[in-house]
Design a protein with these regions (language model features):
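Charged, often Cys/His-bearing segments associated with DNA-binding zinc-finger transcription factors
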Residues: 1-31, 38-39
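Helix-centered, glycine/charged polyanion-binding patches within enzymatic domains
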Residues: 4-7, 211-212, 217-287
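An N-terminal domain-cap segment
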Residues: 34-54
Length: 287
């Protein structure tokens, strides 16, 4: 690729980012959200004056939309014109550090506001076609917790359980997610004990409007369960494109293996969109 072509491509990426954020600017009910969070936000009566609530909310939204760490969100806001314009800042002094953003996220989590905001964002994105609902990728990840983890009553949390993955034992919870296959945006998150099998949660992760569902071999049989969503809301049968286990492919004839490997590669390439999501999901589900 030539420098000129690379510059053109970079310009297109910047334009798309700005256009997307312009749509987000229009659809988010800012006044409603700020009023929802304000009672929980720092009053600034002691110590340093807190950053404006709207700045923090906009940073938090960017972090979730673009799957960024606390530090990366701050750096991108300083470096990206689209991000800084969206947050209404024009110098690095107006941008909080990563630790401050992390504390804000935990404040939302502890006050039960995160789920409300997430549900509203998903609904708005769907309504405007930014989440296309043509297909869903389902997946899960273990959220590790210390064995001493306790609930609000100071007792060992009964929702945290032990599970073996490969040759390693893990203790904690499991995050199950449904991701729009076209945009890569998360539309559903379910949290369970770590020992809950992936396939059990499948139907809870679907919108009911999909034409196709993708998942790894942990979801084999999802379309045959009693609680499976067989047809979408238009009556069309949903295709479950679940990856086979490698051992299943090995048992096939040479010609069958070739076709199967090609099909498995196609499924895996679609599922790859889900991998980057888990970094931010893990951050959202921890205190």
């Amino acid at each position: 690729m030539t420098i000129s072509a690379f510059s053109d491509e970079l310009a297109q990426v910047r334009t798309k980012k700005k256009e997307f954020l312009t749509q987000i600017e229009r659809i988010v009910p800012w006044k409603e959200w700020l009023a929802l969070i304000q009672p929980c936000y720092y009053k600034g009566e002691r110590g340093n004056k807190p950053y404006p609530l709207e700045t923090m909310l906009r940073l938090y939204l960017l972090q979730n939309l673009y799957d960024l760490s606390d530090e990366a969100t701050v750096a991108e806001t300083i470096d990206s014109r689209a991000f800084s314009d969206f947050c209404g800042v024009d110098s690095s002094n107006q941008v909080p550090d990563g630790d401050t953003l992390g504390r804000f996220r935990n404040l939302l989590l502890k006050n039960g506001l995160q789920e409300k905001l997430f549900a509203q964002v998903v609904a708005m994105l769907m309504e405007r076609g930014l989440i296309l609902k043509k297909g869903t990728i389902v997946d899960s990840t273990i959220i590790s917790a210390p064995s001493s983890t306790k609930n609000k009553e100071k007792k060992r949390d009964p929702d945290a359980h032990q599970v073996k993955k490969g040759n390693t034992w893990h203790f904690g919870y499991k995050a199950h997610i449904g991701v729009d296959k076209d945009s890569g945006l998360v539309h559903t998150v379910e949290a369970t004990s770590a020992n809950v099998h992936d396939v059990i949660e499948t139907s809870k992760l679907l919108t009911g409007e999909e034409k196709v569902v993708y998942g790894d071999s942990g979801y084999l049989g999802a379309g045959k369960r009693d609680d499976a969503i067989i047809r979408n809301k238009t009556g069309r049968k949903i295709k479950y494109k679940i990856n086979r286990r490698p051992s299943q492919v090995k048992k096939l004839s040479p010609s069958g293996r070739y076709a199967a490997k090609k099909a498995e590669h196609e499924k895996s390439s679609v599922r790859a969109k889900v991998e980057h999501v888990f970094g931010v999901v893990k951050k959202q589900l921890r205190f």
